[in-house]
Amino acid sequence: MADSSPEVKAVARYIRMSPFKVRRVLDQIRGRTYADALILLEFMPYAACEPVRKVLRSAVANAEHNNGLDPRDLVISQAYADQGPVLKRFRPRAQGRAYPIRKRTCHITIAVRPIEEAEAATAS
């Protein structure tokens, strides 16, 4: 059951951002073409767009360099953010107490594959 179209991915690990905030951006670009996703990431007002844009460009560069694929024919097949390690800090409070602060990290994974001919006909 091997798929004939190669799937190329890129991973950014230990990004100092909550995976919940990154998933909000990834949900918007999943299933879109590379050009559409870049335009969306350029104009969305979220800080998570910058690391996602870097991972997307890396995945497309991997596809272009390693597999010889054309960036115009690529679609985002997978995009997800897994939780990374949590940095634990403490905030001093009144009367000798301390409240925990959890600085979350995430691992961003984006996979691209060539668009199918049937999908290309419906997209045009």
From Swiss-Prot:
It comes from Synechococcus sp. (strain JA-2-3B'a(2-13)). One of its GO terms (cellular component) is cytosolic large ribosomal subunit. InterPro entries: Ribosomal_uL22, Ribosomal_uL22_bac/chlpt-type, Ribosomal_uL22_bac/org-type, Ribosomal_uL22_CS, Ribosomal_uL22_sf. GO terms for molecular function: rRNA binding; structural constituent of ribosome. PROSITE patterns: RIBOSOMAL_L22. Part of the 50S ribosomal subunit. Pfam families: Ribosomal_L22. The gene is rplV. One of its GO terms (biological process) is translation. The keyword Isomerase does not apply. This protein binds specifically to 23S rRNA; its binding is stimulated by other ribosomal proteins, e.g. L4, L17, and L20. It is important during the early stages of 50S assembly. It makes multiple contacts with different domains of the 23S rRNA in the assembled 50S subunit and ribosome. The globular domain of the protein is located near the polypeptide exit tunnel on the outside of the subunit, while an extended beta-hairpin is found that lines the wall of the exit tunnel in the center of the 70S ribosome. It comes from the Bacteria. Keywords: Ribonucleoprotein, Ribosomal protein, RNA-binding, rRNA-binding. This is Large ribosomal subunit protein uL22.
